[in-house]
């Protein structure tokens, strides 16, 4: 793997009773961002972190927090997560009719903006907002739970986003989230991913072993 990328481990796969120690662990094992999956039990069938959790963790690490809002009403949560210390706020195009309004509201608070799409949503759904976002998060599993296998054909969206970025002069980063392991990481990078979100494979050690082997040239 010669192509560089940003590693953003997901705290969804960490021990929820020891998140502060998980941050230390991330820093010690090459993480560049912290990915925080916020779930409301409505947009996805799970409940996870709220803004108070981010507020408590913010002082525990220098790493940027990449907050992924998997919620039905993202606009209601923006101010809380801005105040809590989010560096990126990513919401789903499927959850927000007034996407331009929300993008500009987030940017106006000095936070970088991401837009995400689930596996069943085509890249074309993002065409009107791509000029205004800093990050596009391509879900390669149906969101809600860690440890799922990648839906491989979703990587074609990454390639399409790379092509659109080049042809239209956009500057967004492309993140891939879902089913990243030793087998699928090279595939995601070959497709053009700039940011890799990994949960289970990172915390289990399998992905870290691959990264260490690659960096050593073994």
From Swiss-Prot:
Summary of the function given for this chain in its UniProt record: Catalyzes the reversible epimerization of D-ribulose 5-phosphate to D-xylulose 5-phosphate.
Disulfide bonds: none
Enzyme class of the recorded protein, top EC level: isomerase
EC number(s) reported in the record: 5.1.3.1
Keywords: Carbohydrate metabolism, Isomerase, Metal-binding
Pathway assigned to this chain's UniProt record: Carbohydrate degradation
Pfam families according to UniProt: Ribul_P_3_epim
Gene for this chain: rpe
Protein name: Ribulose-phosphate 3-epimerase
Highest taxon in the source lineage: Bacteria
Family: Belongs to the ribulose-phosphate 3-epimerase family.
NCBIfam families: PRK05581.1-4, rpe
Residues that, per the record, bind substrate: 10, 68, 144-147, 177-179, 199-200
Cofactors required: a divalent metal cation
GO terms of biological process kind: pentose catabolic process; pentose-phosphate shunt
Catalytic activity: D-ribulose 5-phosphate = D-xylulose 5-phosphate
Active site: 37, 177
Binding site for a divalent metal cation: 35, 37, 68, 177
């Amino acid at each position: 793997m010669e192509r560089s990328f940003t590693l953003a481990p997901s705290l969804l796969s960490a021990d929820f009773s020891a998140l502060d120690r998980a941050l230390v662990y991330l820093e010690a094992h090459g993480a560049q961002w912290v990915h925080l999956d916020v779930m409301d039990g409505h947009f996805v069938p799970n409940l996870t972190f709220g803004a108070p959790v981010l507020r408590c963790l913010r002082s525990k690490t220098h790493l940027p927090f990449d907050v992924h809002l998997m919620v039905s009403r993202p606009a209601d949560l923006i101010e809380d997560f801005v105040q809590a210390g989010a560096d990126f706020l990513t919401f789903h195009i499927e959850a927000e009719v007034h996407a331009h309004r929300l993008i500009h509201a987030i940017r106006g608070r000095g936070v970088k903006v991401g837009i995400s799409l689930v596996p069943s949503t085509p890249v074309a759904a993002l065409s009107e907002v791509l000029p205004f976002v800093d990050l596009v998060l391509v879900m390669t599993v149906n969101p809600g739970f860690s440890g799922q296998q990648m839906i491989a054909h979703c990587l074609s969206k990454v390639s399409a986003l790379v092509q659109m970025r080049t042809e239209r002069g956009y500057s967004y980063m492309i993140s891939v989230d879902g089913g990243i392991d030793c087998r699928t990481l090279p595939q995601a990078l070959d497709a053009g991913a700039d940011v890799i979100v990994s949960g289970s494979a990172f915390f289990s050690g399998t992905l870290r072993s691959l990264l260490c082997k690659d960096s050593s040239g073994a």
